[in-house]
A protein has these predicted regions:
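Aromatic-rich, solvent-exposed beta-strand/loop patch
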Residues: 106-111, 130, 135, 176-195, ...
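Extracellular/periplasmic solute-recognition and catalytic clefts
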Residues: 164-166, 222-233, 258-322, 329-333, ...
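Ligand-site clamp/hinge motif
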Residues: 124, 207-210, 240-290, 336, ...
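Gly/Pro-rich hinge or "lid" segments in bacterial periplasmic/extracellular proteins
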Residues: 87-98, 145, 189-254, 261-265, ...
């Protein structure tokens, strides 16, 4: 044999290295973020937080808010029906008692490159759509390409680091990555729903309508009353019903959702037995509105379930696309005028804690001054991020709860003067001499009473706050077109923040209708911090990068932080059962069941009719 020239030897060595890397990649039943061992072994029988022998049957009745006009949740058009995701299966499914571990669903086995440059999914041969057609690799490729091309903008952000998707065999699909730094990407791809190519290829995917789509999941759509109600039926011959990841799940024969336009009416409908379950989000209602015979007789159960998730950030969000809010001094000044202590005492019965961090209730929340590891991340950005990041620990203003906030108003007025604002004829005018009027856009009535004290505090400084409530459809359309001054916005966080942060904070998402960059952030420094967070190579590194990002967001005053609790408040009728062990990171409503030996609540006359249709 002739000796191989040296350049060819180098290429041959690289080939051997690649082959060695592929040989080291063994198919596995689960994926974890940092390759730690999953909680459940390959032969596990069911998750710990289910009743594996839960009875099947009955109808589970829920209430929705507003209405719906679409059965396509994947596009940025219309309002999709609640729970429509139950008709679809995903490649993998996330356990609800681990921070971020996924187990095979449509994909029975998963293979990941040791250097994180690709991931391969092996589809189960028994996986079927509801029409009996097998789920194949070409369906996965079709789904991915369709979501990238025609889906909501968030998918392009989620999958931005995917270079190529290949159907290698009818049941084997490979995703190649642009780089190997995004450790979350294999798990993000595991969340990919599998849409039927043969059903969608002759339909217009971007057309949001009420045609019942073909799915593969544990439920199918049985009946639609546009804007008013939707009914799902459990698929009796569901292909995945005996999988370990599904045992103890999907116990209701039917699930129905009736839509209401008013939260107060919805609560009265629950107490009248019109539906079975409610997640209560209003502290005052939880404290005072359930003093009824059904609760005292323990037929209507009130329960607080532990919530182990980061609570994230809910707040009054500024749209900094508006010139009014582009000066950070203005944003800080207005934040001084929310009297949380009075609001919590008078309106919330003291139920809440003030939110400070964008990663609240987690080890990713910034605390005190940045440590050495955080400074290593932040120092290269000095001069491009607020100076306070390096020298001060962020804190919300604190009042005495009396409702008198003269000191905060004086500080706010001083900041507004520095920004060029001034009082003219008892009205605040901005630096251009225009009277300041702020529209606060709402879709739900319960926040109006919360905003009224804030409105009064602004009025004391000559600022007019207009509270504008619109229906859900109009609200969503205005959010998508960024036609608002301020809103109540939420930035939920998981225990493993990653690709979704691009949708929240990055410049590329600011002009994408449908992204969650409600603020309109276009800051290269924040873009950099987000990418570094996504590419963190260990849990400790993720914590450090999350804290660094948190500090920059806090000192930008992009929202006026609201409040949080660390439990889920649920009310449900006593014919509903749930497992003794609750999952740490979810309510786990799909593990609940109907008790066959307890009669459901007999509905009384409804307080009002449900919504008549989405507008």
């Amino acid at each position: 044999m002739m000796p191989m020239p040296r350049p060819h030897l180098k290429a041959f060595a690289l080939l051997l290295a690649c082959l060695a890397g592929q040989a080291l990649a063994a198919p596995q039943h689960a994926l974890t973020l940092y390759d730690e061992a999953p909680k459940y072994p390959a032969n596990f029988k069911h998750f710990d937080y289910v009743n594996a022998d839960a009875p099947k049957g009955g109808t589970f009745r829920q209430a929705g808010f507003g209405g719906f006009d679409s059965l396509n949740p994947f596009i940025n058009k219309g309002v999709s029906a609640d729970d429509i995701g139950l008709i679809y299966d995903t490649l993998m499914t996330q356990s609800l008692d681990e921070p971020f571990t996924e187990y095979g669903l449509v994909a029975g086995k998963i293979e990941k490159a040791p250097d994180n440059s690709w991931v391969r999914f092996y589809l189960r041969p028994e996986a079927r759509f509801h029409d009996g057609q097998p789920m194949q690799a070409e369906d996965v490729v079709f789904t991915f390409n369709t979501l990238i091309k025609d889906g909501a903008p968030l998918y392009r952000g989620y999958y931005a680091d995917v270079a190529e998707v290949i159907a290698e065999t009818p049941r084997q699909v490979l995703f190649k990555f642009k780089h190997n730094n995004n450790r979350e990407l294999p798990l993000i791809l595991g969340q990919l729903p599998v849409l039927p190519k043969h059903w969608w290829e002759n339909r217009e995917f971007t057309k949001g309508n009420l045609e019942i789509p073909l799915g593969s999941g544990p439920y199918k759509v049985a009946e639609v009353k546009p804007g008013r109600s939707i009914r799902y039926e459990r698929v009796k011959d569901y292909w995945g019903k005996d999988l370990a990841v599904n045992r103890g799940f999907y116990n209701f024969d039917e699930m129905t959702t009736d839509y209401y336009r008013d939260s107060t009416v919805t609560l009265e409908a629950l107490k009248a037995g019109q539906f079975d379950y409610r997640l209560e989000t209003a502290a005052k209602s939880w404290a005072t509105a359930y003093d009824v015979p059904a609760v005292r007789q323990k037929r209507l159960i009130l329960e607080e379930l532990p919530n182990g998730n980061p609570t994230g950030m809910q707040g009054f969000v500024y749209n900094i696309r508006r010139p009014l809010f582009q000066d950070v001094r203005v944003r800080e000044a207005l934040s001084l005028l929310l009297d949380f202590e009075w609001t919590n005492k008078q309106l919330f019965n003291g139920a809440y804690t003030r939110t400070r961090s964008y990663f609240e209730n987690s080890d990713m929340a910034a605390r005190g001054l940045p440590d050495a590891a955080e400074l290593k991340i932040l120092e290269p950005l000095r001069g491009k991020i607020p100076d306070q990041v390096f020298s001060q620990a962020f804190a919300n203003p604190v009042t005495d709860g009396s409702g008198m906030i003269r000191e905060q108003q004086r500080r706010a007025y001083k900041l507004l003067q520095e920004a060029g604002w001034r009082i003219v004829d008892d009205k605040m005018v901005d630096a251009q001499g225009k009277a300041v009027s702020i529209e606060f856009l709402l879709a739900q009535t319960e926040f109006e009473r919360v905003l009224l004290p804030f409105k009064r505090n602004l009025a004391d400084l000559g600022i007019d706050l207009v509270i504008r409530r619109v229906d859900v459809s109009q609200y969503i359309n205005r959010l998508r077109s960024r036609d608002f001054d301020m809103i109540v916005g939420g930035y939920p966080q998981s225990n493993s923040p990653g690709n979704e942060q691009r949708e929240f904070w990055q410049s590329a998402a600011a002009d994408n209708p449908g992204s969650r960059n409600f603020i309109g952030l276009k800051d290269p420094a924040i873009d950099t911090l987000v990418e570094q967070l996504i590419n963190a190579d260990s849990r400790q590194s993720l914590i450090e990068h999350s804290r660094a990002l948190d500090r920059v967001l806090q000192w930008g005053y992009y929202v006026i932080p609201n409040w949080h609790i660390k439990t889920w408040r649920v009310a449900y009728w006593n014919h509903i059962g749930h497992p003794k062990v609750s999952p740490k990171y979810d309510i786990g409503i799909n593990t609940w069941w109907i008790k066959p030996d307890v009669e459901p609540a007999v509905p009384l006359a409804p307080a009002a009719q449900p919504a008549e249709g989405a507008k």
